[in-house]
Amino acid sequence: TASLGPMSRPLKPSERQSFINRFGYEPTMVTVAIDAIGVFVQESNPLQSLSVDQLDRLFSATRYCTFGQPINYWHELLDDSEYSLSDFAKFPEFPVQLFGRNSASGTYSYFKQKALCHGDYRNTVKQLSSSASIIHTVANRMGGIGYASLGSTIPGVKALSIANGGKEVEVNAKTVQSGQYPLARQLYLLVNQSPDKSLAPGVAQFLRYILSQQGQYIVRQLGYFPISSNQQQAQLNNLFQTSG
């Protein structure tokens, strides 16, 4: 049985109950980093930002956030000056090509909740197996747009600002850690730890490391965002108040 499991979302109630039924105690969820879901286009694309409503109209079949009309073509997203100066103007109706994660992914579920108001994805969203594959595909598709973990960013793409409540919010460390950026989420380690036993030495050492300043530096190097020092200490206190 594994002692640690990485997760990009909280446990579902059914998953939590299954864990309790099997082991007889609650799972321990440790927040170790913050991830942002970026909405990516080619770097040369003139589009700079999208609203949450526009994301719903792009990616959702049900459009519960807006009940607006679907967006199918790039001229529906760009103003006249942007469109006329772009490569899209060479084609009368240049379609938006949509890319996202598959249904087994926590990113798929998170974007569905936050950007689609729990609605259904359009069947035109091509599902790919990883954030890296989405970003590589978008980098090579002039009309491509996709959502993916910011940690997978490569040259040749850019993450759009997201307008939330009328205010455009860039994705950066400040907006993600402050909660201003609307598509940010915590990343967890699920710890299988009986409350009446101490953590195994290797598990304890790893958790102390990932929650240290050095461990959080590695988090940053991997393209994610560190949690605050107060959060680090709170997690350590919770883990080691009864464990050695």
What kind of feature is each model-predicted range?
Residues 1-244:
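Flexible loop/hinge segments at secondary-structure junctions
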